[in-house]
């Protein structure tokens, strides 16, 4: 299959997001699509797969003009899109999620459970994963849910597969399994559109790379004929002098301390963070890092242990109590737990600090709007009108809104779980700079990240977890990838 997208433009009201795009996609090729959040990558692929129409332009498939009125039509034609944010129903089982809208029935009109199970297990086998079919999908980790999204696409007869940040929540082993599947699909003649911000993946897996910026295509090249510096410069329109900005904050006394904390999937976790310090938490998926942070914030119940702020023990049994104590928590799954997508930017940003803008029982609209606009300007949130629905923002800008929400409470401690997941290189640097500014003000920061270069580049100290326990601590000077991975896998 050959796809030619010609002169594609798209506007939402007065906001032009794509302008005169020409793009060719070919079966049997892996084609990377790169660009900052808001560059138009996902919008372009949504037009291809029928989620919404182009304002102008034409799509040719094997020389014939064709458009799809919805994604299901595109899937039936052999074009599938795995979105960055997972399209799952938490209460339904894995099997029900896999076959939702594509149920297989017997000649009597009943669900063919046997055949659906067989096909599901075949898809999992190709991915190299083992996931129970009869448990609610909401009980699974983000990484496992992502693998199920990928497995869905394998249930169809594929010609073109679009993947938007498919490895964002995957372990190294799951990523290697995914690459194996991608290479296998390529050998079968399937074309892959691979949207990613991860340079190492682009150079490892793709044949061609197209860079987008501000709704236009900047360049298309064979991947082997370019390099990461060139791609970054084309993506952001400027040279990034240092990927991780230099940190100048003075580290003060201990401000936040956790002692012998035990929960459902971890035990005896102890650590401390000083004023102005960024403490990184590393480990493999399933090591228990997120569970520790959720327990500290009162989302999950603790079994035992103590939490102190400024040497005073505090009791937290709910997120509202955590917020009152001055703890901010950016969760790893922003759309389910960090944002209300139907609310506008202002309402999302002021959710935890509503009382701060209330006088005599009345909400001070003027003061809150001014405050929110300052945050929008400071965080460079694109299309950032306070009244704009958060669901209309790109992933990177949504992440900035969540960050702004917690900055608004003037936190005594800030916990960030995968703060740059699915965020482009330019927005990542802006988030790092913001973290440094908060540290300069003395805010202690705990950062959970599966991005090892990020852990090494941003953290003052690093705690490593393995199978629910702290397996080691490393200073910034002594830490390197080998030492972190050794501790993450249970070594000493």
Swiss-Prot record:
One of its GO terms (cellular component) is plasma membrane. SUPFAM superfamilies: P-loop containing nucleoside triphosphate hydrolases. It is a peripheral membrane protein. The keyword GTP-binding does not apply. One of its GO terms (molecular function) is ATP hydrolysis activity. ATP binds at residues 35-42. Pfam families: ABC_tran. It is found in: Cell membrane. The complex is composed of an ATP-binding protein (RbsA), two transmembrane proteins (RbsC) and a solute-binding protein (RbsB). This is Ribose import ATP-binding protein RbsA. It comes from Streptococcus agalactiae serotype Ia (strain ATCC 27591 / A909 / CDC SS700).
């Amino acid at each position: 299959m050959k796809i030619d997208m010609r002169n594609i433009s798209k506007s939402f009201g007065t906001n032009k997001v794509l302008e005169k795009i020409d793009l060719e996609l070919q079966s049997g090729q892996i084609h990377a699509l790169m660009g900052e959040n808001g560059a138009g990558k996902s919008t372009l692929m949504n037009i291809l797969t029928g989620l919404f129409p182009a304002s102008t332009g034409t799509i040719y498939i094997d020389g014939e003009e064709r458009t799809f009125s919805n994604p299901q039509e595109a899937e039936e034609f052999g074009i599938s899109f795995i979105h960055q944010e997972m399209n799952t129903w938490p209460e339904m089982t894995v099997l029900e999620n896999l076959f939702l809208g594509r149920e297989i029935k017997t000649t009597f009109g009943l669900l063919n459970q046997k055949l659906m199970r067989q096909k599901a297990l075949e898809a999992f086998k190709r991915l190299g994963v083992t996931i129970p079919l009869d448990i609610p999908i909401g009980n699974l980790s983000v990484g496992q849910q992502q693998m199920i999204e990928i497995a869905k696409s394998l249930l169809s007869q594929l010609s073109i597969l679009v993947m938007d940040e498919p490895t964002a929540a995957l372990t190294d082993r799951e990523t290697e399994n995914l690459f194996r599947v991608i290479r296998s699909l390529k050998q079968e003649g399937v074309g892959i559109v691979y949207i990613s911000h991860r340079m190492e993946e682009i150079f490892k897996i793709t044949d061609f790379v197209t860079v987008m910026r501000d709704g236009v295509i900047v360049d298309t090249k064979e991947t082997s004929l370019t390099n990461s510096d060139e791609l970054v410069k084309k993506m952001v329109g400027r040279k990034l002098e240092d990927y991780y900005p230099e940190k100048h904050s003075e580290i003060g006394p201990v401000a936040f301390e956790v002692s012998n904390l035990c929960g459902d999937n971890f035990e005896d976790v102890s650590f401390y963070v000083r004023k102005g310090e960024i403490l990184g938490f590393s480990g493999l998926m399933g090591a228990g890092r997120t569970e520790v942070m959720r327990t500290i914030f009162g989302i999950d119940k603790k079994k035992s242990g103590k939490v102190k702020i400024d040497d005073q023990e505090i009791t937290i049994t709910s997120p509202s109590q955590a917020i009152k104590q001055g703890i901010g928590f950016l969760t790893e799954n922003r759309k389910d737990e960090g944002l209300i997508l139907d609310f506008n930017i202002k309402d999302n940003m002021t959710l935890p600090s509503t009382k701060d803008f209330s006088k005599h029982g009345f909400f001070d609209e003027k003061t809150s709007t001014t405050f929110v606009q300052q945050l929008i300007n400071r965080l460079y949130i694109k299309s950032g009108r306070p009244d704009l629905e958060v669901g209309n923002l790109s992933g990177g800008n949504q992440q900035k809104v969540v960050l702004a929400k917690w900055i608004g409470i003037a936190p005594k401690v800030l916990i960030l779980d995968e703060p740059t997941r699915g965020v482009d290189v330019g927005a990542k640097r802006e988030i790092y700079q913001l973290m440094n500014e908060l540290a300069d003000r003395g805010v202690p920061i705990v950062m959970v990240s599966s991005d090892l270069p990020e852990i090494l580049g941003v953290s003052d100290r690093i705690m490593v977890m393995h199978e629910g326990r702290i397996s080691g601590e490393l200073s910034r000077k002594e830490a390197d990838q080998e030492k972190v991975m050794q501790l993450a896998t249970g070594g000493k």
